[in-house]
């Protein structure tokens, strides 16, 4: 979850405002936070497309915005990932180890089966049901093996009980904070200027 609570930033902006302009700050802050959250959501979806492997619409639509309102002492809003999607997206954000409930994770050993993310290329499982490819547990290694020549075999895919995520390709928090830093103050000044113009 990424929370947008810019109380200190709002206080800093108020120092340079007139008494009339300061009255506009609460509403301007709410509007600015909500505008910025929409930009954060769009930016996160763009990052998903760039950093995740062929994200589905289910993944791209995983973000929920809670808008700022007048109910809190200081305006704040937040954006988070729905729980179902967060169960697998979290490994792309924070890394870690996921454990298989059943069957194991298919991990490609053969480089020809890997995509640019190092994962099994889509559709490749259909290639294993050939005369040369077979499933076996050999010396404790479960996987898809291939017969090479008369007497040799090679491991193409290993089934692992856990998947270790060392890389963290999706910078969820960094992306959100960069967008907030780039856009919030601009929108605050725009809304305050509109109020000032209206009051003249």
Regions found by a protein language model. Name each.
Residues 1-200:
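Short, Lys/Arg-rich flexible segments
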């Amino acid at each position: 979850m990424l929370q947008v609570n810019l109380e200190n930033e709002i206080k800093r902006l108020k120092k340079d405002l007139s008494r009339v302009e300061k009255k506009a700050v609460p509403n301007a802050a709410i509007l600015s936070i909500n505008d910025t959250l929409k930009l954060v959501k769009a930016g996160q979806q763009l990052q998903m497309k760039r950093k995740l492997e062929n994200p589905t619409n289910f993944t791209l639509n995983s973000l929920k915005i809670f808008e700022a309102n007048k109910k809190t002492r200081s305006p704040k809003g937040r954006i988070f990932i729905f729980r179902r999607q967060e169960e697998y997206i979290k490994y792309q954000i924070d890394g870690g180890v996921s454990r298989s409930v059943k069957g194991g994770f298919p991990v490609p050993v053969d480089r020809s089966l890997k995509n640019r993310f190092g994962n099994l290329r889509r559709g490749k499982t259909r290639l294993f049901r050939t005369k040369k490819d077979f499933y076996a547990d050999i010396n404790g290694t479960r996987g898809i093996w291939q017969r090479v020549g008369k007497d040799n075999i090679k491991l193409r895919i290993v089934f692992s009980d856990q998947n270790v995520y060392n890389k963290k390709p999706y910078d969820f928090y960094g992306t959100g904070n960069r967008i907030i830093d780039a856009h919030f103050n601009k929108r605050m000044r725009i809304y305050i200027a509109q109020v000032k113009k209206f009051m003249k």
